[in-house]
C-alpha cells in the first residue's frame, strides 16, 4: 500500500498517472497538427492558427474534459484495476478517492468556464461531452461492443470540436476520422483481452468475458479488414502526399497484428499488441506533417 503521508511530488505523479497526462499531451499535439495541416483554411498560416485564442481555449477545454474522464473512469474501475494494472494502481492510490472526485468536479467546472469564453455552443458541446464520458464510465462500458464503440467515439470527439470550429467538413477529414475510429475500437477490444483476468474476476461483461476470446478475436479481425476501406479510399481518391507511405506501412503492421493476435494467449502478448496499436496512432499523428511538405514549410514560416 502507498505510504500514509505521500509527498506533494508523489501526489502530483499519481494524479498525472490517473489522468494519463502522456495521452493528453499526444491529443493536444494531434489537435494542433490536424488544425494546421488538415482542418484550418489554407489562407491561415501556422502562426495564426497556433496563436488563435479560441482554438487554444477549445484544445484546453478538451484536455480538461478528457482528464476528468480518466479520473471518473479510474474511480469506477478501481477494483478490477487492482488485478489488471497492479503497478499503475499502486501509483494512482497515492491520491485518495475523495481527492480524485474533487479534482474531477473542479476540472469539469473549469472546462465549462473556459468554453464559455468561446461561445454558448461550446458550453453545450463540452457539457454534453462531460456527461457522455460519465455515462460511458458508469453504464455504457459494461455493455459488450457498445462500450468499445462508445470509448472510440469519445476519443474522436475532441477533433470534431476543432473542425466544427473551423467549419471544415471536407470528406477527406471524415475518411481520416473513420480510419482512426476503427483503430481505436480495435484497441479497446484488445484492452478487453489484455484485462480478461480482472474483468472475469469482477464479472465485468466485456466481449471476451461474455462470448469468449475467439469471438473477440473474430470481431477484431473483421474491424482490421474494415480499416483497409478508408485506407484504399485515401490512397485512391485524395491527395495525401507522403502520408500514403504511412498508410501502406500501417496496412503491413495490421496484417502482422492479425497474425500475432490469433496466436496470442497471455496478458503480456495482448499488451504487446496494444502497444503496437498505440504506436500506429501516435505515429499517425506525427505523419500528418507528410500530407504536404510544401504546406508544412509554408505554414511554419
Question: Which ranges hold each PLM region?
Answer:
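Short, membrane-interfacial amphipathic segments enriched in basic
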Residues: 1-9
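Intramembrane alpha-helical segments
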Residues: 8, 14-17, 88-170, 175
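Small-residue-rich segments of transmembrane alpha-helices in multi-pass membrane proteins
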Residues: 26-34, 91, 149-166, 208-213, ...
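Membrane-embedded alpha-helical segments that form the functional core of polytopic membrane enzymes
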Residues: 28-76, 111-112, 123-134, 169-190
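Transmembrane helix-loop-helix
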Residues: 49-58, 102-143, 218-278
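Solvent-exposed interhelical
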Residues: 61-112, 180-238
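Juxtamembrane boundary at the C-terminal end of a transmembrane helix
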Residues: 289-301
